[in-house]
A protein has these predicted regions:
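Positively charged, solvent-exposed patches that mediate nucleic-acid binding
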Residues: 1-107
């Protein structure tokens, strides 16, 4: 996802889940899977923002086969800079579970 209006549509119409490091905005859509990753300037300079987005992309790739179709937007919070990858991973899985985005409810 790259268009501002796509992001705004999901922000307004989708449901959201918060954790200490990540915010998920999710809009279920059949047959369509779009993903966006954002990090505000509150996080820090471009290096820190890009690192946060790379971490979120890596986590999404791990779970992408087990998720239902829809539009996902992951917003990195300021605390992601100091957090370990393991802690971010736990937060990531927790918000995906709370948002009921897994195909299999056993995960």
């Amino acid at each position: 996802m790259k268009l501002h209006k796509e992001f705004q549509f999901v922000y307004k119409k989708g449901k959201n889940q918060h954790s200490s490091n990540v915010v998920l905005f999710f809009l279920p859509q059949n047959g369509i899977r779009k993903v966006g990753f954002t990090a505000t300037k509150k996080i820090g300079n471009a290096v820190k923002r890009n690192r946060a987005k790379r971490r979120l992309r890596a986590l999404f790739c791990q779970y992408s086969d087990t998720l239902i179709d829809g539009t996902y937007i992951f917003v990195a919070k300021q605390s992601i800079v100091e957090s370990s990858f393991e802690h971010i991973h736990l937060d990531f899985k927790k918000i995906l579970t709370k948002a009921n985005t897994f195909k299999d409810k056993l995960l």
